[in-house]
């Protein structure tokens, strides 16, 4: 399933799940309106803004400090787009765990899709906690419909025998 990133709550949950899955201890900031991304690489470049931000200070590795924040900005069409420098991303904790910006965006998309399904498919009717990882690394979210429980009046009476007894006053 390929979708556009339009739901900020699902994007936030997807990013948080992806970071946790790869043991990247980073906070995802949410800003509305968009706020400026930090850039320690080129102070002369025009500032970039994003609505969801992973600060560079959370993306350092033992061998290198990250130079740029990673963000997602809502564009004029209402979808979120990745704002990241591919070179810096490949060097930081995200790149070390996931890969380049294309691979990162693909992984975000998978977690976003899972978050959308979990938001829209009622957990009272559907069990969606099982995620299968296939041989090729693809993730599959398995949805199974929960059985609908039917409780008869007889079962209610046996559970609480006095619940259905009414006394009539003379």
Question: What positions do the PLM features span?
Answer:
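Interaction-mediating elements
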Residues: 1-170
């Amino acid at each position: 399933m390929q979708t556009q990133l339009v739901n900020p709550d699902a994007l936030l949950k997807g990013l948080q799940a992806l970071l946790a899955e790869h043991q990247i201890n980073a906070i995802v900031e949410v800003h509305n309106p968009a706020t400026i991304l930090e850039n320690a690489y080129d102070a002369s470049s025009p500032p970039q803004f994003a609505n969801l931000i992973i600060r560079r200070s959370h993306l350092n590795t033992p061998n290198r400090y990250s130079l740029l924040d990673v963000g997602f900005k809502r564009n004029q069409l209402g979808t979120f787009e990745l704002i990241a420098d591919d070179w810096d991303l490949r060097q930081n904790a995200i790149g070390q765990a996931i890969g380049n910006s294309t691979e990162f965006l693909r992984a975000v998309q998978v977690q976003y899709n899972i978050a959308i399904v979990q938001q829209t498919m009622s957990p009272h009717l559907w069990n969606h906690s099982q995620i299968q990882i296939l041989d090729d690394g693809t993730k599959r979210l398995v949805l199974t419909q929960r059985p609908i429980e039917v409780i008869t009046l007889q079962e209610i009476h046996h559970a609480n025998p006095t619940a259905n007894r009414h006394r009539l006053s003379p």
